[in-house]
């Protein structure tokens, strides 16, 4: 998020990568404010880690409130899941993530709809793997 200086975030990412950690797990609502963890990670990826993209496993999640209106209130609807992924990819400056998760169960959306949206993300080349956390 924005509460930690970007240079500190850079030092943390460099140190973890140098120690062999290559899985960076994010979510659309990580911050504060929401989305800032992905934005900052994307900035550092571009500035420091772009040559190492194929060595990284980058995951993100969607499922919590993110924007006003009927489809931004989180959950597992196809509209929300796919819009959230597009927004996450834009914030990180990526074409795809390695793993895209539905962050939480949504009692108002059939699991089949959420699973179908996740499968669409793979078919569209926006995620290599999917999961439910």
State what each model feature region is.
Residues 1-57, 95, 123:
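N-terminal binding-site loop/beta-alpha segment at the start of enzyme catalytic domains
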Residues 37-41, 54, 58, 77, ...:
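Generic hydrophobic, aliphatic-rich segments that mediate packing or membrane embedding
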Residues 26-28, 56, 60-62, 101-104, ...:
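A cross-domain feature marking catalytic cores of carbohydrate-active enzymes
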Residues 28, 32, 39, 60, ...:
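Generic detector of intrinsically disordered, low-complexity, polar/charged segments
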Residues 65-133:
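Glycine/proline-rich, positively charged
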């Amino acid at each position: 998020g924005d509460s930690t200086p970007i240079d500190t975030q850079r030092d943390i990412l460099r140190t973890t990568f140098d120690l062999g950690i290559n899985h960076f797990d994010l979510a659309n609502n990580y911050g504060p404010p929401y989305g800032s963890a992905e934005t900052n990670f994307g900035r550092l990826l571009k500035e420091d880690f772009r040559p190492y993209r194929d060595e990284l496993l980058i995951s993100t999640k969607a499922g919590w409130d993110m924007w006003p209106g009927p489809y931004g209130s989180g959950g597992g609807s196809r509209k929300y899941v796919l819009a959230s992924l597009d927004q996450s990819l834009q914030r990180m400056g990526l074409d795809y993530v390695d793993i895209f998760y539905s962050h939480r169960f949504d009692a108002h959306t059939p699991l089949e709809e959420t699973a179908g949206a996740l499968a669409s993300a793979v078919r569209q080349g926006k995620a290599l793997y999917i999961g439910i956390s």
